[in-house]
Structures are given as C-alpha cells and as structure tokens.
Amino acid sequence: MNFKINLDKKFLSRTSLYILNITLILLTLNFLSNNFPLVDEALLRISTIYLLLSLLIFNLPIKKIFYNLKEKHEEKNSFYTLLIGIFLVLFSFILLLSTKIVLILLSSIPIFISGLDLTLKGIKIKRKEFYLLSFFSLSYIMFYLLIQTITVFWHIIQRFSIVFSSSIGSLIGKSMVLGPTVSGLWIVIIFLILSIVGFILSSNKKIQIIKFLIAIVWIFIGWIIYLIVISFIEFKLKNDVVNLHIVLFILCLIPTLIYLIKSNIEEERVINLNIKKINIKKIIKNGAVWALLFLFLSTLLLSSFFGLKDSKSNEKTKIMFYGQNMLGSWDIPEYGKYGREASGMFGLLPIYLNASGFENVLLVNNITTFLNSTQPVYENITRYVNLTDHIKIIESNEVTADLLQDIDIFVVTNINKSFFPNEKQVIWEFVEKGGSLLVLGDHTNVGGIQEPLNDLLKPIEISFQFDSALPLDSKFNWLTCYQLIHNPITYNTKEFDEIQISVGASLNTSVNAIPLIIGRYGLSDKGDLLNQDISYLGDYQYNQGEQLGDIILAAATYYGEGKVIVFGDTSTFQNSALPYSYSFIYNIIFWLDSEQTATTKLLQTGISIVLLLATLILVFTYKKTRIPSAIFPIAFTLALSISFLVNPLLIPDMQISGNVVYIDASHNERFNLEPFTDKSINGLILNLNRNGFLPIILREFLQGKIEKSKIFILNAPTQSLTTDEIDFINKYMSNGGIIILATGYPDKEASNNLLKKYSLDILNVPLGPFPYVEENPEEYENEPRFVDSWPIVFNENQGRSFYNFSWYIDYHLMVFVKQGKGGLLLISDSQYLLDKNVESIYDYWPGNIILLKNIMDEFQTLEE
C-alpha cells in the first residue's frame, strides 16, 4: 500500500484528532462491554465518563459555542442543530449516570457521538470520523444485543474462540482452550466491526477492498501474536488476563487506524427537513423513515419479554421434588447442630416456596424412613418445625405419568442412580407436553452423580463436565467474574451476590441452549480421579488444556412445549444461600411456569430479525432521501428504554408472606454480605431458621415487601433513615411488626431520628466487650456476650430492659419499646448480631443463641 502522508501542520492536527477520537471511543466501548473489567463498577463508570469528557475537551471550542449561543442567528437551522447536539451530549451523560443496564450504557455512546457531531456542525465544524463512529457504535451495540438475545450467536463465537486458540496452541506445542473473553476475541470483534463499517462508508469500494482485506488480515495477525504471548503465561487471577488485554488492543488498533486514515470515508449527506413544510406522503415514501421504524420495532422485540404470563394464574403452581437416590439431605437448621453442619441442605427450599404460594410435593421410596432420618428431633429449646406442614410427601418406587399428571415443575437434584428407561420416557413426555424440569448437579462427579444426570439430560444435549468451575478472581470469588445473558430469569437480579454459586461443574451444551449464567472470568478445573477423599477435586489452579474463560454455569432450553433449566451447582438452592438467592429462585420458578414456549420465542425472534434485515436493506439501497443519522441511535435507545420499563411489569416481583424476616441491606449496614466471615450474619440467619422464620436480605427499602413480614432487622445502618421510612416503620410496628435495631454509639447518627421518636438514646460511654473475660471463657458461655457495647437511655414508662448489668449503676444493653401491636428492640452493639459473636462455621456462643431464642419467644407472645 502507498502510505504517503502530507506532513503539513493542519493535516497532522486533523489526523491526530482523528486517531484520538477513534481510540477513545474504542476504549469506551471496551470498558462498558467489560472487556477491560475493573473490580469496582463505580470506577468503570467514572473511567468511561472521563474518556467522554476528554473527547469533549479535545473537540469542542467552548468559547465559540458560547458565542454562538449568545448571538442572534440568521441561520436558525445551525442554531437548532447546536442546541440539539448539546442536549444529546447531556442526555448521554444522564444515561451513563442513571442506570446499571449494560445495553443502556452502551446505547449512550452513539447518542454522545451524534450529539458531539451536531454540536460541531452547529458552529460550522465538520469531523467526518463522527459519522463513522456513530454508525460503528450503533452497529456494535446492535451486535451486542443480538449476542444477548439470540444466544446461538454467543455459542458460535465461544466455539470459534476455543477452536482457534486450540489450533494456535497445537502449532506452537501448547494446549490452549480459551473462551472469547480470555482469548480477546470480543476485543477483536470490535475492531472488525469498525473496519467493516469503515469499508461500507468508504467511496470507491473496488479500490478500497484490498486495503480493507489487508487490515482484516493484520487484525488477525495481531490476535495470533497475542495468543502466542499468553500461551507462555500462567494465569492465576483475573488481573493476569486483564493486564494483557491492552496489548491486544494496541495490536488491533494500529492496522485499523492505518486503514481508516487511508480510506476515503464518505461524509453524511442530509437533506434538512423544514418542519413547516412536512409532507406526510413524502414521509411515508421515505425509505429512511421506514428503516428507522423497523429498527425501533426490531430492537423493542429483541429486548422485550413476551409470553411470560402464568400458565395457571388461578391455581397454585405444583412443584414435585425427587427426594430419593440423591446426594444431599432435606435437613433444616435445628438446635443441637451448630457450626459447619448446622445449615442442612435443601429442607428450607420447599418451606420458602410454600410461603410464596407454591404447592410442594416430595417423592420418596418410604415416608417413614425419610421422616426418621430428616425430621429434626424435638427438643425443649426449639419450636418444632414440621416439614410435612410445608410439603406433601408421597411414596413411590418410580416416577410415573400419573404422579406427574398434575405437576407443573419437576425438580431433580444430585441423583446418584439413573432413572429407568420408562421413567426417563415419562419425564420427557411430561416436559414435551408443557411441563418444566429443573435439574441441579455438582462438581467432579461427587457421589457418583455425573453419569445419572448426563443420562437424564441426553435429549437436550446438556451435560455436566468432570470439573470444578472456579472464578479467577479469588478475592471477590464469582462476584466480579459473572456474566448474565439478557433473559427474564436473570433480569431482576440486581446484585451478583443473589446468585450464590460456589463450586460446581461447568456445563457442556448445544447451541440451542441459553447460557443463563456465564463464568466469563472462570476456569474449568479438571477433576482428579485419584482425589477420592476430596470428591475428585482438581488442584484449583489453571493447567494448560483446561478451558479458561466463558464457561457455562447454568443453562436453559426448550423441549417441545416445555422448558428445562440446568444448574452445575446446587449452592444457590441450599438452606444457607436462600436468604440471598430466593428472589433469583423465585424468577426461575416463574419462568418455568410461564406460558413462554419455543414456538413463541422463535416467532418473536424471527419477526425481529426480519425487521432488522429490512432496516439494513433500506439503509443501503434507498439513498434518494436521507434523514439525520443521529435519529437512529435515538430510536434504538428509545426502544431499549421502553422495553426496560415494560419488562418489570411482565416479570412479577417476588411474593412471600408468613414468618418472613427482612434483613436490611439498603442503608449501608455494617455487615458483610459474603457468607461465613466474622462480619457476616449467617449465625443470625441460622437462629431465625431454628425458630421457624424465613430471613431474606433486602437490598432496597421496599415498603410493600416489609409490611408483609414479621420482623425487620437493621444492623448498624450508616445511611440515615428518611422521614418517610421512619413514618412507615411506625405504622409497621403499630400493625404488629417488630423492628430489631443493633447499633452502637459510633453508628447511631443514621438512626438518631428513629431513636428520638421513641425516647431512646445511646450514650457515649464505651463499655467495650461484656462480659470481659481473660481466662476460662467456658464458664461464661451460657451468658450473653457483647463485643462493643454502649449504655441505652430510655423512658421506663414506655420501654423495658431486655438485658442489663450492674457496675455501680445499671447499664442497659437491650431495650424493647412497645408500639401498637409490635415494637422496637434496640441492641447497643453494632457487632452483636455478627457471626463472630453468635455463630460461625467454626464456633458459636451458647449464651447469645439462648438469648436470641428467648427474644423470639417473647415476640411470639406479642402476636398471641
């Protein structure tokens, strides 16, 4: 190629700005797509805003803009163009700051580019790269939407990455199995889309075709060089992968920029529309207008969830659990079992589901044997939780059509014995006719579950691999390593800690399966048959030949008129996870019970694809009349915004009532949401379970939910309660609700207004740990223990002390104030309810467990 470059200052200035603009937009799209992931989401957002602000600083002559805004304009079109441009730029920043939805965040970029372009045009400055960048960014976001909604495309890209990286590895004598995130294919795709758009917008395509193909080849050469480099690196943490992504970015950037600089990109040709002379007939005949409409409808269809109505809205959904030949138990937390084994496994799941109005059935071989092994032994200390109050237990040696006749969802968990052929036929006929199947498994063939599970799942081509799916980020576990595909099951998942996956198997699926949860920065750690004592687990390290990146942790698919969901890990559904994950589980059950089928989904997808193809045909063939290109990203974003406003109405929020306890996490409370640490609240959760309560972590202060609960717990909130929230709390207690507030003097500021309302105060007199014991702590273990206590002052005519001690004077550490049918319990220790003081997997304090039990009994008398 002939790379003669004019070296005059003007050209260098324009070329430098051209390169800078393209580079900053490429970086922005990669940031928002999580191709350069940052641990802190806020930091990612700030970085994106800084990149866009840099674009404004380098491109906008601020003085000239102010001058144009102040002066009277003879050319009103230029003035309106300037105003519209400024509005779009501001609107793009509003989008960036107001949502966490990746698609909306991405859609802000073409709006920003269009706004910047219009602003410059309003002051008679032309930047031809903005037309290219607007077209490119919109094309990329449309591609991203297709990957998210038509997951066969995701599978194709994932498999191409694995095959390509394996091929390069075999050529250099290295074994590599890399998903597109680790291999960098997602970054490569962004550059490919930019190059393709540049070619489409270039004039003299016959001349440009050679340059275009050379650029594509060099992008792939850059990718190959990158793969060779990383083949010699031992990956342990996510940062090991991330730190090298910038190398690939540069390798792809150089040939792309050279190609674009030498390409003759066409400038946008727009006929100014005079609003006063709008002709409806001309608009109808304008192909660009129809392209705009088709893009809007296609985007709306792709991003919206239709066909999600309950299949039996007037009847209870019936769920059958297969309770035999399985690894695991149906135990529930009970007194007498503490520490690591206290939680049990799956016994609380049907109890939670029953509280949400679902009817549960458990299928076992022998009812008597099952109850003798599962039902907790009655002790004087505990309120007896009868499992049969929440689930109907039926007896049968095999699964039959009659048993499944009235069932909506059939749940199979960790089976270690294959179903008989006639049972498998019954199950799949049940699904084919509209029933739903939920299959839960675990890692490395633990307990011999892999073959029976894979045997069951053959008709849908999903299988459990002999591995452990591990996150690459050891500090944050899976929280920074997930990717959720756009679908109704995960749509309401606001925080990744709701998923609660721990260590399970990765799934091998067909291209028809929907990858619900992807371990984007995950590792498929192959099992070791020699490690029988530790469930065949591998070495918890990356070894060459193991898949790195984009492993599937959970998948869904359609079969006939029915639906199937498969989880490679059971942790989400276990007792200890339910307070965090139940909202997510509720969405799973809702989707399985919905009317959406393969036919309705295929119809919705097919129509949207036809509309999108029609858009492309009109854009590239109808050139007589154009409309401003800025309208296309606006239409796209409008369609996305409408769908994201409508979708929550199509997916019901979690419904649960009864003995529900909400633990607030919406006021920056001082406890750790990560389970089983010193600062976690799992010990509190276990003791609530033992007393028949169903605790749930509440991430938003939702009055409609709280009013249906029995107890609302705030543990050292650091964000102040609002006046409306305090008024609601007062009404909640008047109607019988109980508030438990644990806060010491250092944290009381956020709760001060609530305390004052009930004549309560916490004095600045540090009492420290109580009782203070240096030797023989076992002598005091049946007494309550405080970590950092402070004295409470209260009106003895309104409240009463639940716990106090005397040291010259009386110090009250727990006070209850009655309000209507309920009341407020104040604990003057921010750490009293934490695991380190109540119960952890390694230790527990009997005195606090007994005191919590007495408090629960006291609350029961209030109800009576």
Features from the language model and the residues they span:
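Coil-to-alpha-helix initiation sites in intrinsically disordered, low-complexity, charged segments
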Residues: 1-2, 163, 583, 597
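Short, surface-exposed patches at the edges or C-terminal ends of soluble domains, predominantly
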Residues: 275-864
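Hydrophobic N-terminal alpha-helices or hydrophobic patches in metabolic proteins across all domains
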Residues: 2-287
